[in-house]
Amino acid sequence: MKGLKRTLRFNYPREWSGGVKGNQYFLGFTDMLYELNKMIPNTNARMIEIGSYMGESTMMFASSDIFQEIHCIEPFTGEEEFNQMYNYTWDEVENEFKINTRFFDNITLHKDFSYNVNNNFDDNDYDFIYIDGAHDYNSVLNDLKMFLPKLKQNGIIGGHDWGHEW
């Protein structure tokens, strides 16, 4: 799984940043969108985002104009690590998601856990799946098992900040 982890996570080459220091998450994300735009020729592209939290990545996906449909799976409950770090409640997180995504009509929120809604998505129907939900090994592995069949042939899967312990 360690080799698979490196393959599925978007690890852009450092030289792409042009030596610019700053928010590497943002730079990496915009670089990923640039590459996705080249790799997904379908103008009717569809994606699933597992774990949307406050909708910041969702907003960037929607702003990219790559995806006609973005399906977000977010229960707005669960791991408390970030909420405790930044003193947020889940209601505040959900409200921020709504604020961040309010101007986009191509976003559908599925307010639930991925294991409860995975059967709502057809197999071989999605161009891109982005996994950023629960970050422990078993949860990521289960998301991969449940959602890999949802990808079209030559579809792309990516993710963000999976657990460092594996």
List the model feature ranges, each with a label:
Residues 1-166:
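A short alpha-helical cap/connector motif
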